[in-house]
């Protein structure tokens, strides 16, 4: 029974649970790697050895956190669990493909970890730029293993994206318009479209790199008429939509949390929120070269990418102000998910402001590859995506096993985590402005103060992670069952009770229009 249920599962709730557990495990691996980085940088001088091993750790940290923590939890975990419940579908459109989507992840993670363990590891950074990622600078199997790992996780995400798009468009009740689906469903839909359009380009780029390394092609080798800049264009055409893939489901979750704990039936400006997400998704594809301001592009090209990047701030601002408007006049309940959501809104805004600064190509020439960039994207990832995941987890946890997390412990956990991530990443802005470059294992003594503070912050974040494991254990040990859930008519995922039955909506849901009700 256990093998058929968990290995051959075709149930969206079970596969979502597998994704959540896998993501939690990968998150701990990624956290361990990040602590190695911060231990190395806690004071001047070498700890682990040379820059190669340092960069192997940094590269693995990025890949693990992006592809095996954030995406499986947000899209695989919350997406699988909530989308069918929110649209009244009995399951996903392709349940077996859903299972395959998950089971491609563990072998992919194994390949990635193997790539770090053989030869000298992948010391290229997560971008794997040639010629550093080529077979001269990185001889041996490491980079090839990492490329295969990316192929698998890419196939997994593409299959998942096809599944979500089909499910959301085709499996709503017949009378329901797309504009009646909850915002989280919209966010997963936009995310899935981004995945479907961007991942094939990454696959093309890394496949060309694979043949350059092993079959003597010269796609990225000027000696044979190739161009390493081509790889950068292909990579960032995927890489920029990818960062929006990481944050969009978080937008959807935060919209639900803010509305719920403000006692509102719906978020402020539903249509504006939907169109903002679609605008972010579209604009995300036409700004990729802002990662390449230092490779020698024409001034008019730089002007375009600067302007286009700044325009993304407009729909993002629409979302931030709509969340604030949702709070306005609400009967606010200061429960833990609301704290995570408010932290998310504030820190996403800070990360967005540093993003506007980096969008200026003239400024970016100076700030590119400094810790300012690291601070910027960790504000939107380590404090945007992660705070959204934590808020979603605390909010929807009662739905998954049917038990409630401890209200006081989760608030303390929020406080510790919030202090930890801010102490880790705010000093990095000053390091970047002072010119400290990224991807070096050592630094001049002048940078010691901010680095030591940053490393102390990372230790505080570690205590928060351990505390959260205790909170999860406590919930399963105490077995506090859910009593009642408020506002179920606008939060239909709760309608079937906590936890919901194994099969929900076994016959098509009947949706009555608001007009008919009056």
UniProtKB/Swiss-Prot annotation:
Details of cofactor binding: Binds 2 heme A groups non-covalently per subunit. Binds a copper B center.
GO molecular function, one term: heme binding
Disulfide bonds: none
The protein's required cofactors: heme; Cu cation
Mitochondrial matrix side of membrane: 1-11, 87-94, 171-182, 262-269, 328-335, 401-406, 479-518
Keyword Transit peptide: no
Catalysis performed (reactions): 4 Fe(II)-[cytochrome c] + O2 + 8 H(+)(in) = 4 Fe(III)-[cytochrome c] + 2 H2O + 4 H(+)(out)
Cross-link (1'-histidyl-3'-tyrosine (His-Tyr)): 240-244
Gene Ontology CC entries for this record: mitochondrial inner membrane; respiratory chain complex IV
EC category: translocase
Residues the record lists as binding Fe(II)-heme a: 61, 378
Pathway named in the protein's UniProt entry: Energy metabolism; oxidative phosphorylation
Binding residues annotated for O2, in chain numbering: 244
Binding-site positions, heme a3: 376
Residues engaged in binding Mg(2+): 368-369
Binding site for Cu cation: 240, 290-291
Family matches, as SUPFAM superfamilies: Cytochrome c oxidase subunit I-like
Family that this chain belongs to: Belongs to the heme-copper respiratory oxidase family.
Subunit structure: Component of the cytochrome c oxidase (complex IV, CIV), a multisubunit enzyme composed of 14 subunits. The complex is composed of a catalytic core of 3 subunits MT-CO1, MT-CO2 and MT-CO3, encoded in the mitochondrial DNA, and 11 supernumerary subunits COX4I, COX5A, COX5B, COX6A, COX6B, COX6C, COX7A, COX7B, COX7C, COX8 and NDUFA4, which are encoded in the nuclear genome.
Protein name: Cytochrome c oxidase subunit 1
Taxonomic source organism: Polypterus ornatipinnis (Ornate bichir)
